[in-house]
Amino acid sequence: MIDSRDREKILKAISRDECAELTKQLCDIASPTGAEREIGEFILDWYARHGVKPIRQEIDANRINAVGVVEGRGQGTSLQINGHVDTSFTGTEEDRLFCAELEPVSELGGAVRDGKVFGLGASNMKSGVAAFMVAGKALKRSGIELKGDCILAAVAGEISRTPIGPYQSGSYRGEGTGTRHLLTHGVQSDYAICADRSGHSIVWAQNGVAQIRISTFGNPHAAWGMTREQEPPEENNA
């Protein structure tokens, strides 16, 4: 059992600036759905350099899952912290054709200004991935021994694109592809936390998926909720 002194020891080893800089570095690496290999290799190298056991899960020629493990004694339950590294846009100059009017201050790469991190994928969800990477490093360096494994899974293919009809290329293989591959190829845990925004509260995440094709005209964009309820609602809404 980790007591308050152990907890403080770990927290003191976590730097806000390191989290921000690592988020920036992740945003500097283009990782659209279907092309997550480069960022995955970066994460695996980072794990190895900081004493976290790296596990490479091959998905296809262009994508991998990057998993790190802070190993326990094998006498307790395991916990996975999961986050995706793919983004809706490409991270190239092509994006400006679509995003210039919608988000004129957006950065293609990463930037830290006025105490904030900017860049494609910063909020969804490279900041969450950077946070658990830094936390894993701090946990490992603390020397505190866990009973069970702490698994840090940076996965491909979460963005809600699904191969339907003529849309069958790698860029449409999202909707949980990476996590499904993770679980069916040997990386499993007793419990899991998704490193997405939730206001530090327990929230409903997703209770199902409806795949509907709708054709529209105009500037492309995405629809999502930027905030979540502070407490789970009585009705199981996403």
What are these regions (language model features)?
Residues 96-101, 135, 169-170, 210-212, ...:
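Glycine-rich, phosphate-binding/catalytic loops in enzymes
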Residues 76-151, 160-162:
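Active-site metal-coordination/substrate-binding segment of hydrolases
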Residues 85-87, 116, 153-173, 187, ...:
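Acidic, glycine-rich active-site loops and adjacent beta-strand->loop/helix elements
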Residues 173-238:
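Midchain, well-structured core segments that form catalytic/ion-binding scaffolds
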Residues 67, 151, 211-215:
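Beta-strand secondary-structure signal
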Residues 93-94, 162-167, 204-206:
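Short acidic, glycine/serine/threonine-rich loops at helix termini
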